[in-house]
Swiss-Prot record:
One GO MF term: ATP hydrolysis activity
Domain of life: Bacteria
Family per record: Belongs to the GSP E family.
UniProt-listed PANTHER family: BACTERIOPHAGE ADSORPTION PROTEIN B-RELATED, TYPE II SECRETION SYSTEM PROTEIN GSPE-RELATED
Full protein name: Type II secretion system protein E
Reported induction: By the two quorum-sensing circuits LasR-LasI and RhlR-RhlI in a growth-phase dependent manner.
A Pfam family matched in the record: GSPE_N1E
Record's subcellular location: Cell inner membrane
Binding site for ATP: 263-270
UniProt enzyme class: translocase
Presence of the UniProt keyword Membrane in the record: yes
Function per UniProt: ATPase component of the type II secretion system required for the energy-dependent secretion of extracellular factors such as proteases and toxins from the periplasm. Acts as a molecular motor to provide the energy that is required for assembly of the pseudopilus and the extrusion of substrates generated in the cytoplasm.
Length: 502
């Protein structure tokens, strides 16, 4: 091909849809507008197949304009210069590690990037967001579109915080790419959608649950990160006191009965159930679950997922499971009377049933089941115990700062202010990303039902009476929090934050 000097590139009044940058650079092809005429510029030794693909992309045949190597590179840079040269370097250098905010600033504002499947800056940005979230042990990533801005927030250790504010124009690109990764319908923006992404990051398998929601300013996306390693925990990893761990271990090894775990959303109930199942999973038991959704896949355990579209409810799944000769049954949540009745009957016919309830206290679970319509005499016969729990942030061991408790703190902790204990406060360092906390642990109230508690339930005693008896046999959830404060694991503020109703 003959080469021509670099022409003056005039920005067209209505620029055509450009070739994706990676294709243009790799194949040596570029759309140019010269004197109101569109050309397909090409560097030496370009492949005919690439020319044909570019013509197809343009939707019409464009005349060819041959350029030398240097001239082509200058034209390429000039054509994409408003994307910034940093963004072009970004598309090439896939292996580089870049600052998240800088990465967001470098992403070009062009829908053409969606044509790329492997090295688009928008994909690099999403990968960087996911990688940073996993490094910080975030449980959720929020992409929130407002009228004039786009915000990315992480929920780390139960607390939501803003980490990035990309250009508002990137909202549609980010949402579309996430939808592609989660195999959702990218054209459907009027209704909520749910999907799933599986990744391997740094040797760790991570599942991501994706939820989209239409809003006034565009779709909002929340990604729930599920670390598959968390499904391999056992009871020793949950931060229980020695007393609670031993009692819990004894309780889950009972041949039949119901054990409930209670607490608000995000308090670690599912993790506790999985740890209990892992403890029991010794190949001598048939363990089956019905969940919504399956958060972690457990080897050697049969797991079934609720599917409302085909009327596969907790109750229906539980009925089916009971025909599969189970020893242990885990029901993700008891939401209605039907599920509760089946669970109680299963426990009375020789099965161990584990499940969760959304109540604030351990004894509150009994009241909730009675309110659902379960007869107290059935509960008194079937219930083994209830574990109430919350999650508190753990102080960063590298920077936590000791200090003497003041009078108010001594009163909260139930200690003599004349001899104030040494407590610790959050400070912040590089190890914990300046947050002062690293990770979370549970605080618990385990009520194992004895004969007296069963008689109280059978006689329909008040919740206050049952609570008073529970306090005689073990600490409350706030008592367990106080213990962790005195041990330097967490702070008074954290315990108060999660136990305000106590």
């Amino acid at each position: 091909m003959m080469t021509a000097p670099l022409p003056d590139i005039a920005a067209p009044a209505a620029p055509p849809r450009r070739l994706p940058f990676s294709f243009a650079k790799r194949q040596g092809l570029l759309f140019l507008c010269l004197e109101e005429q569109y050309w397909l510029a090409c560097r030496p030794q370009v492949e005919l197949a690439a020319i044909a693909e570019a013509q197809r992309f343009a939707g019409r045949r464009l005349p060819l304009k041959a350029l030398g190597e240097d001239a082509f590179n200058q034209a390429l840079a000039a054509s994409y210069q408003h994307d910034s040269s940093a963004a072009m370097q970004l598309a090439e250098d896939l292996g580089g590690s870049l600052d998240l905010a800088a990465l967001a600033d470098q992403v070009p504002e062009t829908e053409d990037l969606m044509e790329q499947e492997d090295d688009a800056p928008i994909i690099r940005l999403i990968n960087a967001i996911l990688g940073e979230a996993i490094r910080e042990n975030a449980s959720d990533i929020h992409l929130e579109t407002f009228e004039k801005r786009l915000v990315v927030r992480f929920r780390v250790d139960g607390v939501l915080r803003e980490v990035l504010e990309p250009k508002r124009e990137l909202a549609a690109l980010l949402v579309s790419r996430i939808k592609v990764m989660a195999r959702l319908d990218i054209a459907e923006k009027r209704i909520p959608q749910d999907g799933r992404i599986s990744l391997r990051v740094g040797g760790r398998e991570v599942d991501i649950r994706v939820s989209t929601l239409p809003s006034a300013n565009g779709e909002r996306v929340v990604l729930r990160l599920l670390d598959k390693q968390a499904g391999r925990l056992n009871l020793q990893h949950l931060g229980m006191s020695e007393r609670d761990r031993k009692l819990m271990d004894e309780t889950v090894r009972k041949p039949h009965g119901i054990l409930l775990v209670t607490g608000p959303t995000g308090s670690g109930k599912t993790t506790t159930l999985y740890a209990s199942l892992t403890t029991l999973n010794d190949r001598t038991r048939n363990i089956l679950t019905v969940e919504d959704p399956i958060e972690y896949h457990l080897e050697g355990i049969g797991q079934t997922q609720v599917n409302a579209k085909v009327d596969m409810t907790f109750a229906r799944g539980l009925r089916a499971i009971l025909r599969q000769d189970p020893d242990v049954v885990m029901v993700g949540e008891i939401r209605d009377r039907e599920t509760a009745e089946i669970a109680v009957q299963a426990s009375l016919t020789g099965h161990l049933v584990l499940s969760t309830l959304h109540t604030n206290s351990a004894i509150g679970a009994i009241t909730r089941l009675v309110d659902m319509g379960i007869e107290p005499f059935l509960l008194s016969s079937s219930m083994l115990g209830v574990l109430a729990q919350r999650l508190v942030r753990v102080l960063c061991p590298a920077c936590k700062e000791p200090y003497r408790a003041d009078e108010a703190e001594c009163a909260l902790l139930g200690v003599d202010p004349a001899a104030p204990p040494t407590l610790h406060r959050a400070r912040g360092c590089g190890e914990c990303h300046q947050h002062g906390y690293r990770g979370r642990t549970g605080i618990y109230e385990l009520v194992v039902f004895d004969d007296h508690m069963r008689s109280l339930i059978h006689n329909e005693s008040s919740e206050q009476e049952m609570t008073r008896h529970a306090r005689t046999s073990g600490p409350s959830i706030r008592d367990d929090g106080r213990r962790k404060v005195l041990e330097g694991v967490t702070t008074v503020e954290e315990v108060l934050r999660v136990t305000r109703e106590e």
